[in-house]
Amino acid sequence: MAGSESRIVECINLMVMKKVYWTLVAIFVAAALGGCVNDPTEMENAPDMSAGSRKILTSAEAEAGELLVKFSKESIAAVEAGVTRSESTRTGIQPFDAALKEISAVSVERVIPVVEQHEADARASGLHRWYRVRFNDQVSLDEAARKLAAVEDVEVVQYDGYVARNFTEMSAVPYNNVWSSDRDQINTRSGETPKFNDPMLNKQWHYKNTGDETLVSPIKEGCDINVEPAWEFCTGDPSIIVAVMDEGVMYKHEDLAANMWVNQAELNGQKGVDDDGNGYVDDVYGYNFAKDQGDITWTDPEDSGHGTHVAGTISAVNNNGIGVCGIAGGSGNNDGVKIMSIQIFAGRYQSTISRNVDAIYYATSMGASILQCSWGLMSGAINSDEQYLDERSIEANAFAHFINTKRPGSPLNGGIIIFAAGNEAGACGYPAAYPSVVCVTSLSTDFTPSVFTNYGMPADIAAPGGDLYYHKNHSDAGQVLSTVLKLDGMYAYMSGTSMSCPHVSGVAALGLSYAKQLGKTFEPDEFRDMVLASVNDIDSHLTGTKTYIPYTDSATGIGYDGLMKMDTYKGQMGIGMIDAFKMLMAVRSTPAVTVGQNKATKISLGKYYGDVARLTYKLSVSDEVADKLGLTYTTGEDGTVEITCTKQGVGLVSVETSNGGSEVSRELAIICRAKIASNGGWL
C-alpha cells in the first residue's frame, strides 16, 4: 500500500483540496536556488521516493467524483489509443481499467483539449499526460485515489477542487465619491502639459507622484513607477497580449474596449461553433473557465469589478479624452497592448484547479506573453517551495508550459507570469512565492509598505498598490485609480497587492512593446532578470515606524494593531520598486543612472563602459537634453563625471570611449528626480 499512497495527492487549505506526491525533489532544489523555468515534471534522473509513504489527510472539500491522474511517459501512448477506442471510458491499460470499473468510472478525458497546432507544445511540457477521471460521486475519494495510485503506470493522482476568491482588498470607491467636482478637469499641477488628455491621469499618483498633499497625505514625491518619461519612447504595441486571469474583464468598458484582445474567427463566426478549431467555443474576448463558456461576464452577484480594475492599470486606452490611463495603453492610435480575459471567477461560480490549468494552456496557445494573476492562496496555506510542489503538481506543470512555450512573432521566446504577493500582512502566499513566477508586494504613496502587504524572501519586486487606513485626508485617493464596472461609475479606487501586481505586468508589457519596436527578442529568464533589475531602491526609506488606523480584515478575521516597524520590511519587499523608464532602457541596452534635482552626482563611467586605466572618456550632451534637464557636468581624470540637473526629467547623452585608436560612442540615460535614495540611485 505504501507505493500507492505515495502517488496520491491532496490539498487541505482554503482554496483547493489536493495533495501531490512529487518524486522530483531535485527539480525543486534547482528551482529554489536558481529560479529555473524548466518543467519540473519533465526532468529525468530524479531520486525515487516511492518507499516513503505519505499520510493521507483528507479529501473532504475536494470535488466529489473526480480525480486528476498523470500517466507515465512510457504508458501515455497506450492510454491515448485506449481512450480513443473506448470513447473515454477505458484506457487500454488493464490494471487501470480494472480500477476504473471498481470505482464506477464514467469518463476519462484529457485535462487540456487536443488541438493539432498546439499539440507539440503540450507534449513538450508534459501537459498531455494529465487526465481527469470522473466516477460515481458516492464512491470515497480517498479509496478511489488509492485504487488508481496502485497502478504502476500512474505517476500522480491528485484531488481537484474549486478555487476560491482571495480578494481581501477593500470595496471599490467610485471616483465621483472622492472628486465629485472636478471629474472633467485636467489639473497640470506644476504647470506642466500632460502627456495625454485623459482627465483623471493627474489623480493616478502611482504613475507620476509629485508629492502633492492636496491629493492625499502622507505622500512623497517620486513614489511612482516613472512611466511618463517611458511614454516618450513607447506607449504600447497591439501585438503584445496580456492575459488577465481574474474576474471577467468588462470588454465593453469605454476606456478598455479598444484595447481588448479579439478572436476575429469567433467574432465573425457562428454562435455555438468552435470556428477557429482551438477547442473552445465562442471565445471572442477570452474564455470563461468559471462557467465553462465563451461569454465573459461581469454582472453576476458578487462580481466586484476586480478583473476590470486590474486590466485598466495595464492597458486603459490613453489619450482618448476620457477616464484614466493604462501603463501600456497606447497613444490613442489603436496602439495599446491587448487584454485577454481569462475568467476564473464569475459571481458565485469559480474555476477548479484543473480548469485553471486549462486556462493557462489557453492563454499560452492564443498568444499571451504575460499572465497577470492577482489571486492565490492565503498566507500560510503553503509554507515552502517543496510543499507547493508536493501539493500543486499540475499547476506547476502549467506554469512551466506558459513560461517555456514560444509564441510566433513575439519578442519574448516564452512567457512571464506575475503574481500578487497577498494581503494578509504575513508571508508571501503561493503560487506567488514559487520561484518561477514574479512575486509583487505593495507600496503606499510614500515608499512605505502598504498596511496589508505580504512580504518576505520570496518577494521579487514592489509596486504601488495603495493604502486605505493610513492616509489623513482624501484617504481613498491614496488607493489605485483604474477602470471598474458601471455600478461603481466606471472608474474607482481600490487597494491591494492585486493592484500593485498589474503595475509590474503593465511595465513588462511596455518593455515587450519596446522590444517589438526595436526588433529585439529575449529569452524568458533574460527578460525576467531585466524586469527585476529595472527598479529604484526602497530600503533606504524604511526607517522608524508607520502608524495607521487599526482594523480587522473582514475576510480573514485578523486584527491589525495600527503600528508597523519599518526595519521588519527591509530586504523583504523585493529588490526595489519597478521603474518603467529603466525597463525600456534595459530593453534598449542603455545603462540608466538617477540623479537628484539640484544635487551634484558623481558617476563612474568605467562601471558601464570598461577599465578606466585603458580607456579615455568624453561625455557629449545635446543642447536639447541640456536645456530639458538643466544639465551641467564636469569630467574627472579617473573616468568619472559629475552631473548636476536643475529640472526633473530624463534624457539620453553620449559617452565616447577611446583606447588611443578606435573610438566608440555609447548611450547613457540620465534620470533626474526630486529625491533619490541615499545610495545615489545605484542598486
Named regions from a protein language model:
Residues A30-L57, K675-L683:
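Bacterial Sec-dependent N-terminal signal peptides
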Residues V37-P40, E232, G236-P238, E247, ...:
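Substrate-binding/access-modulating region of protease and related hydrolase catalytic domains
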Residues M43-S181:
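Inhibitory N-terminal propeptides of secreted protease zymogens
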Residues Q117-R132, R146-I241, V249-D255, N259, ...:
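Protease zymogen maturation seam
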Residues E152-E155, K220-Q293, H309-T313, V317, ...:
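Acidic-leg catalytic submotif of subtilisin-like serine proteases
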Residues A230, M245-K252, A265-N278, T299-S304, ...:
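Flexible, small-residue-rich helix->loop connector segments that border functional cores
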Residues A311-I314, M340-F345, S369, C373, ...:
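Hydrolase catalytic cores
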Residues A600, G610-T640, L668:
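Surface-exposed or secretory-pathway low-complexity segments enriched in glycine-proline
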